[in-house]
Amino acid sequence: MAVPKRKMSRSNTRARRSQWKATAATLTTCENCKAPRQSHQACPQCGQYAGRTYAEAIRTDAVETR
């Protein structure tokens, strides 16, 4: 297993990590309700994906408590 021979300085570490970036999620429009949604996922507004309605995708404001 590779082990670093010398300690990497703080500036070199930060310069190396500066290239790590999160990519923004690509949004598409829902064909049914025209709301923005993520690709390959059911619409959070109407719950449709590929012409089918999924009840689990519909969000509710009420939170169930046990």
From Swiss-Prot:
Record key words, sorted: Ribonucleoprotein, Ribosomal protein
One annotated GO molecular function: structural constituent of ribosome
Record GO cellular component, one term: large ribosomal subunit
Region annotation (Disordered) ranges: 1-20
Regions of compositional bias (Basic residues) in chain numbering: 1-19
InterPro entries with a match to the protein in the record: Ribosomal_bL32 (IPR002677), Ribosomal_bL32_bact (IPR044957), Ribosomal_zn-bd (IPR011332)
Protein name in the entry: Large ribosomal subunit protein bL32
Assigned protein family: Belongs to the bacterial ribosomal protein bL32 family.
Source organism of this protein record: Beutenbergia cavernae (strain ATCC BAA-8 / DSM 12333 / CCUG 43141 / JCM 11478 / NBRC 16432 / NCIMB 13614 / HKI 0122)
PANTHER family listed in its UniProt record: 50S RIBOSOMAL PROTEIN L32, LARGE RIBOSOMAL SUBUNIT PROTEIN BL32
Superkingdom field: Bacteria
SUPFAM superfamilies (UniProt xref): Zn-binding ribosomal proteins
NCBIfam families per UniProt: rpmF_bact
Claim: Transferase is one of the keywords in the record: no
Gene giving rise to this polypeptide: rpmF
GO BP terms: translation
